[in-house]
Amino acid sequence: KIKKGDKAFVGSEFFGKMKWIADVNDDIYDPTYTDMLRVAFTSEFGRGKLQDLVALLSGRNFETKQYEDAIAEASFDKLKQGILAFVNKTHFDRITMILRSAGFILSNMIGSQNAINFAYILYLRGRRENVPAAELERMVRRWFAMSMLTGRYSGSPESTFDSDIRQIDSRGVIAYTDSVIPNELPDSFWTGMLPQFMDTSSISSPYFRCYQAAQIKLGDRGFLSRDITVTDLLLNRADVHH
């Protein structure tokens, strides 16, 4: 449809960089246009509010309150780099692989699109800071699980995105995540709060989803089974529903 209906886009460099998406069957991360803008903008500009993107593309100088052509031009250039990083196949494959390696192997196990969006932002920023691959993947997994368990991006996601990315800009991605995660998930969370949160019949509970992910990551067997894993059970159930 795009090839026939949007000749201008097909002729742009963006189409060539993202046409691989047509062959993707993985629905773990199925971003919208807004998700792409949010990740590209936040990771590249160090800001989390999309209204700031509109202002910057208009040439807004936040210090002088004036509008300058040079700022508009630089902002479009910067956004372009962010979008190209977002649609880079290697980057996209890596973030979905990280989610799967954390145990989140099905899309219905992920209740927060913004938790994935910020995980992708962390990944892109970590790459820019030259964080070693193994350390970066571990950090993104831990942050994503923390975001799911605490509902970090469920209330006012833009404000939280903005606060988090500014702290990352100031302190560096590893230092910031290493300080936040134990603060958000202290021992008392695991021993006191989480058992209470798990007392629910809802299978869409983020706590239950994270419990399933932990079982998958640890290779746990199904109840009263020697051979069938939790992974097998969940994948089989997903196949039946499809």
Model-derived features: positions:
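Active-site-proximal structural scaffolding
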Residues: K7, N88, F92, S112-A115, ...
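Intrinsically disordered, low-complexity N-proximal targeting/linker segments that flank membranes
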Residues: M148-H241
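Solvent-exposed functional surfaces
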Residues: K1-S188
